[in-house]
Amino acid sequence: MMRVSQLQLCRTSLSYRLRSGYHHHHHLHHSFFKLIKRNSILESPPTNASHQSPSPITPMVNARVMFFSTSTSAPHPEKINRTSSENILRMISSYLWMKDNPKLCFRVISAFACLVGAKFLNVQVPFLFKVAIDWLSSSSFVDSNPYLVAAFATPSSVLIGYGIARSGSSAFNELRTSVFSKVALRTIRTISRKVLSRLHDLDLRYHLNRDTGALNRIIDRGSRAINTILSAMVFNIMPTILEISMVSCILAYKFGAVYALITCLSVGSYIAFTLAMTQWRIKIRKAMNEAENDASTRAIDSLINYETVKYFNNEDYEARKYDQLHENYEDAALQSRKSFALLNFGQSFIFSTALSTAMVLCSQGIMNGQMTVGDLVMVNGLLFQLSLPLYFLGVVYSDTVQGLVDMKSMFKFLEERSDIGDKDIDRKLPPLVLKGGSISFENVHFSYLPERKILDGISFEVPAGKSVAIVGSSGSGKSTILRMIFRFFDVDSGNVKIDGQDIKEVRLESLRSSIGVVPQDTVLFNDTIFHNIHYGNLSATEEEVYNAARRAAIHDTIMKFPDKYSTAVGERGLMLSGGEKQRVALARAFLKSPAILLCDEATSALDSKTEAEIMKTLRSLASNRTCIFIAHRLTTAMQCDEILVMEKGKVVEKGTHEVLLGKSGRYAKLWTQQNSKLEV
């Protein structure tokens, strides 16, 4: 495979980052932590939320979405409604109970049936143990319990039943996990798809103003939060509530209200203490996470700038700075461990006090002849069974609180509305009816920021099947014109029409399906060459993909690769040279076969030889199509039917190459400047 040199890689990557606003540092930082995250799916009980697996869609949003060159855009006011925790839980419940999917509803019912079955058998374990002990320790047991004797016959049978109850409870728990996992994973899948679809529905203005790192964190944390909350609800909160209720009722029925009161008071104290301590520990944990992030960021930044560190012999300096930040993490982590020890001691003290009180009452009952040794064992067993779910209460509470916060951010994001292509409005519009593909701008005004006008009342027309080149200095509004046609932005005033139809009054999908784009920086998917070409028309056959590659003059090059069309192009296509990537973009355009072609300085970053080859292919692609070329090199512009010269958002000259040279105006000056550079 033809590989670009290290210098070409750096230049290509730098060009992409400068034009698209791609944050290389954040990307590496994010990727680093992706590697060290543990993969996990719905577990029981849940661990800390930070260790659960992220949504499959998060890598997809790790780069800022851009089109052509970057321009500063006006802040987009967020149109969001306040999302309460109750509404979030209600929304999750709606995904859990999908009325249109009876199989999933049956799984939900089955999971709750397994939950009840597990807890019912769980409370039988201490009871059966009590029966066995009383039977073995009291000679009067057989006479006073004829029904139990008839049911079990021997103490060994009771102990076998004890084992069956324990195993059955465990089996129901595992069956509940197995049955409910399908529901939980489908819920996560449904919401993840909705998030990705929402990302693509939002307009470019939103993406230009949204911090990529913040957006990525919202999606990542929100998807993990779904897993956390579902785990907490199904595997911790609901089972614990059910078990506390059952234990309290059994104790009240068998031994009196005082035992139920002890249970309720101890559980209430335990929960209150745990929640108060957890609130304090959340603050400590937050400080620890921040310190850890600072240290990790410093280490990664140092490694990213490895060569710079070596140039100035600053290895010791970097190590000291990292050590200072890691010391902050060490202090915070130590504080966290101390608070955790205090939490454990407090929980143990409350539980031990309640258990001791109950045991003292039981011993008095035994001394008075009102209770048996088996009763003491039963009370002890019932109370101990509450200790495990209560032990995880702090983790569950902190994860649930954080999960609700993260989900609020994600659901607010889902409530964002797009200024362009709102589906409710768009589906009511008629499709674009092509009659040749003529394009007209009628007194168009546009600005990204109120104080900076980009297009200032421009008007021009591109006849169907003709080609127009737009030239001018940087910032004159050339690429913005292409954005207007593709309707990434709407005009502030004026009209953009295709075949006499205002593009705001036609269905967005039909508009964009009629337009092909060849950008300056072709960013490819990290997939095969075949996939990247096929992406231009997903309904195309293999032979049509090969024909498109031949027309783009890249088929022979691909066939020389060891894996041919199955060759992976690498992240953003960096395994291919600039010319090869442009040919892939051209092959996509051939495959799409649009009526209108937009090219944004498609050859400006290429050498002269590659430019000539690409231009030859472009002329073939542009044949009998309405084409607009944003041209940096005027050798591209001179071959078009008409040239528009732009300055400060206005068309200052227009005509053919020869006519504009004859005017000795702005175009002639640009031509002279470029030729002078070539001569030098």
Swiss-Prot record:
Binding residues for ATP, per the UniProt record?
448, 472-483
Q: Where are the transmembrane segments?
A: 109-129, 145-165, 232-252, 255-275, 340-360, 376-396
Q: What happens when the gene is disrupted?
A: No visible phenotype.
Which tissues is this protein detected in according to the database? Mostly expressed at low levels in roots and flowers.
The protein's predominant localisation is: mitochondrion
Extract the transit peptide range from the record.
Answer: 1-75
Domain of life, per UniProt, equals Eukaryota
- What GO MF annotations does this protein's record show? ABC-type transporter activity; ATP binding; ATP hydrolysis activity
GO terms under cellular component? mitochondrial inner membrane; mitochondrion
Q: How does it assemble?
A: Homodimer.
Protein family:
Belongs to the ABC transporter superfamily. ABCB family. Heavy Metal importer (TC 3.A.1.210) subfamily.
Q: What is this protein called?
A: ABC transporter B family member 24, mitochondrial
Task: Quote the gene name from the UniProt entry.
Answer: ABCB24
